[in-house]
């Protein structure tokens, strides 16, 4: 990943790729904490300059992968913009629906880390109201999971975790409450 990052430095129009490479290198080298502030500044700068980021699948992927890196307050602004844009998510292609669902699942994890319960409800509702198709079932389940976690529904948490443990046990190991 470091070699790719260095090769990308030669391209003036590859800023999005450079940011993604830096993010990958930081994660693989287990240096996310050390580079968080610098990466966050680069991401903020990029999003502020690029008005089309909400329509760009690569930028949406970067947002989904960097929710724990971006400054919390700036991230809240980005998430609110996405929530407004994608209110009628069923009108978008399936890939976009999945990507936005994944972004909001990652964001709910950040909200949990920050104990930002008041901010969580609208993202939980979004996930729970995704179209009822198999490809979005996991995101809907994660909405149920975070609903139970944030709003202390022990029975709902036990039921949702039971399903998640059978379907995606590796994901359960990374969840905040098991």
Cite the ranges covered by each PLM segment.
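Helix-turn-helix repeat elements of alpha-solenoid scaffolds
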Residues: 1-4, 32-42, 72-84, 114-125
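Generic helix N-cap/helix-start motif at coil->alpha-helix transitions
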Residues: 13-23, 54-62, 98-105, 136-142
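Intrinsically disordered, low-complexity segments enriched in Gly and acidic/Ser/Thr residues
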Residues: 104-143
């Amino acid at each position: 990943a470091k070699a790719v990052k260095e090769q990308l430095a030669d391209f003036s129009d590859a800023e999005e790729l450079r940011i993604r490479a830096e993010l990958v290198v930081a994660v693989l080298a287990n240096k996310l904490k050390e580079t968080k502030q610098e990466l966050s500044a680069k991401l903020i700068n990029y999003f502020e300059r690029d008005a089309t980021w909400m329509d760009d699948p690569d930028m949406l992927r970067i947002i989904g992968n960097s929710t724990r890196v971006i400054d919390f307050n700036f991230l809240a602004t980005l998430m609110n913009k996405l929530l407004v844009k994608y209110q009628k998510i069923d009108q978008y292609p399936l890939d976009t629906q999945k990507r936005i669902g994944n972004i909001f699942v990652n964001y709910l994890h950040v909200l949990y880390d920050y104990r930002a319960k008041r901010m969580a409800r609208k993202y939980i509702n979004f996930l729970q109201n995704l179209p009822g198709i198999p490809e979005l079932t996991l995101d809907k389940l994660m909405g149920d999971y975070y609903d139970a976690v944030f709003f202390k529904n022990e029975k709902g948490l036990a039921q949702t975790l039971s399903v998640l443990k059978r379907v995606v046990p590796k994901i359960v190991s990374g969840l905040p409450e098991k």
